Amino acid sequence: MVRAMTDVMHHTLYDGRRIAFHFTPGAGPTLVFLPGYMSDMSGSKATALFAEAQAQGRACLLLDYSGCGQSAGDFADGMLSRWRDEVLALIASYVSGPVLLVGSSMGGWLMLLVAEHLKHRLAGMIGIAPAPDFT
């Protein structure tokens, strides 16, 4: 099934946070795109990846971190550990099998934090101008 980018879904976390996402099922490993700082799933990199995944019949997950894009919350409450946990919750709920993480800018840093928790499910990582550690 081809999903339009206008078909936004929401996942409610244990504490009530509502995370907006797009998911298209398909062959694995599932591509999971992690946007950069103050970016969201409607950006050009995310939408291009989603369209290409659909064209190739690949599974793909895009999301907006809490406080970003179409997700609920205040951006000022965001932190890497919080966003990492949101990504992991969506993967646990919607993705079966191996995961290929794609991180852009700050999403590259988040990609490393998520990868630590995926262990054997991690098929690989692709960094697009990754920016781990802003200090």
Report each predicted region and the residues it spans.
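N-terminal cap/lid segment of alpha/beta-hydrolase-fold proteins
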Residues: 2-25
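Short beta-strand element of the alpha/beta-hydrolase
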Residues: 28-36
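The serine-hydrolase catalytic nucleophile loop
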Residues: 37-50
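Conserved alpha/beta-hydrolase
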Residues: 50-72
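Catalytic nucleophile-loop/oxyanion-hole region of alpha/beta-hydrolase
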Residues: 69-94
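Short beta-strand immediately N-terminal to the catalytic nucleophile in serine-hydrolase-like folds
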Residues: 101-103, 128
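Gly/Ala-rich beta-loop-alpha elbow adjacent to hydrolase catalytic centers
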Residues: 103-111
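Active-site nucleophile loop of the alpha/beta-hydrolase fold
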Residues: 126-135
